Amino acid sequence: LKCNKLVPLFYKTCPAGKNLCYKMFMVSNKMVPVKRGCIDVCPKSSLLVKYVCCNTDRCN
């Protein structure tokens, strides 16, 4: 699986066991992702932070 880094022009290949891509936003500013990368379990969103996870190459 390949996941975009913070700047979507760049990506990395996820290590074994991390088979989801994610991006994280501040709820107050959904237009600007704060983090992107590989993850094993999608974190729950909170009042301040929203996570979006997916499982195809460079989907984040």
Curated annotation (Swiss-Prot):
Origin: domain of life: Eukaryota
Alphabetized UniProt keyword annotations: Cardiotoxin, Cytolysis, Disulfide bond, Hemolysis, Ion channel impairing toxin, Membrane, Secreted, Target cell membrane, Target membrane, Toxin
Entries under SUPFAM superfamilies matching the protein: Snake toxin-like (SSF57302)
Keyword Membrane tagged: yes
Disulfide-bonded cysteines: 3-21, 14-38, 42-53, 54-59
Coiled-coil annotated residue ranges, if any: none
GO CC, any one term: membrane
PROSITE patterns: SNAKE_TOXIN (PS00272)
Record's keyword annotation contains Membrane: yes
GO biological process, one term: killing of cells of another organism
GO MF term set: ion channel regulator activity; toxin activity
Compartment(s) of residence: Secreted; Target cell membrane
Tissue: Expressed by the venom gland.
Pfam families (alphabetical): Toxin_cobra-type
SUBUNIT field: Monomer in solution; Homodimer and oligomer in the presence of negatively charged lipids forming a pore with a size ranging between 20 and 30 Angstroms.
Protein family per UniProt: Belongs to the three-finger toxin family. Short-chain subfamily. Type IA cytotoxin sub-subfamily.
Summary of the function given for this chain in its UniProt record: Basic protein that binds to cell membrane and depolarizes cardiomyocytes. It also possesses lytic activity on many other cells, including red blood cells. Interaction with sulfatides in the cell membrane induces pore formation and cell internalization and is responsible for cytotoxicity in cardiomyocytes. It targets the mitochondrial membrane and induces mitochondrial swelling and fragmentation. Inhibits protein kinases C. It binds to the integrin alpha-V/beta-3 with a moderate affinity. Is cardiotoxic and cytocidal to Yoshida sarcoma cells.
Name of this chain's protein: Cytotoxin 5
UniProt source species: Naja atra (Chinese cobra)
